Amino acid sequence: MMRLSGADKMSPSERVQLLESRLGLSFSRMETALEALTHKTYVNETRDKELKDNQRLEFLGDSVVNLAVSHRLMARCPGLPEGDLTKMRARVVNEDGLARVARTIPLGDLLLLGRGELMSGGREKNSVLADALEAVFGAVFLTSGLDAAVTLVDRYFADLLDEVSSGQGRLDYKTLLQEMAHERLKLQPRYRVVSESGPEHSKVFEVELMLGETAFARATGRSKKEAEQSAAQATLEKLREDAACPTSPPPGTPRHDTPA
């Protein structure tokens, strides 16, 4: 029998009140705040038709966070080209960065999770925390407006923004991809050099990234490591897109075509 912790015994209203206290704001609609804290596994287990999971709010919150972070990066780095700003934003708004912010609130103990998710350590999973954080920002936007959401970005993303603005926030995309691929797909990324071009002192390497049996991304770089990091970054972004809007089987899943 699983022993319940203090976090598991909290009522829904207590969770919302604690969230309000930690964020320093009040939600005009408690049900919206509670939705942000509700994982899909909890809804599946309770089978309450009135209960909603946080996936739609996560979808909205992703855009809210990206907008606010983009605005702050433009203000911090005047004159920086669009491509560089995009790369900087990706070093802030990713599963690792979002989970880091969620832990500073902290958010994990407030989440409503199914028993299976609880037993597998869901309160500390980067994927669960990152999704919940975006859902909270979606709820803040709906109930308090964009200004309130931007104020929270200024407070909680300040360290990450400082790091990338000063050039320190270079994330290891290969490690992040390895963790995500193992957690979500039970697959191990594999890299292989497809081609080398250019003179010996200035070679360009093209690397292909495989997930399962699928060639998932290609990227180039001045070194194998640089090319692998770029391929891993592109794959991470695609996996996040697929998770937000699943329209096909996960990459690496064997295809079973129906005979004509």
Swiss-Prot record:
Major place of residence: cytoplasm
Ranges of residues in domain DRBM: 172-241
UniProt cross-references to SMART domains, sorted A to Z: DSRM, RIBOc
Catalytic activity: Endonucleolytic cleavage to 5'-phosphomonoester
Location of the protein in the cell: Cytoplasm
Alphabetized PROSITE patterns for the sequence: DS_RBD, RNASE_3_1, RNASE_3_2
Ranges where the RNase III domain occurs: 16-145
Record-level GO cellular component terms: cytoplasm
Keyword set, alphabetical order: Cytoplasm, Endonuclease, Hydrolase, Magnesium, Metal-binding, mRNA processing, Nuclease, RNA-binding, rRNA processing, rRNA-binding, tRNA processing
Biological process according to GO: mRNA processing; regulation of gene expression; rRNA processing; tRNA processing
Broad enzyme group: hydrolase
NCBIfam families: RNaseIII
HAMAP family: RNase_III
Function comment: Digests double-stranded RNA. Involved in the processing of primary rRNA transcript to yield the immediate precursors to the large and small rRNAs (23S and 16S). Processes some mRNAs, and tRNAs when they are encoded in the rRNA operon. Processes pre-crRNA and tracrRNA of type II CRISPR loci if present in the organism.
Record-given protein name: Ribonuclease 3
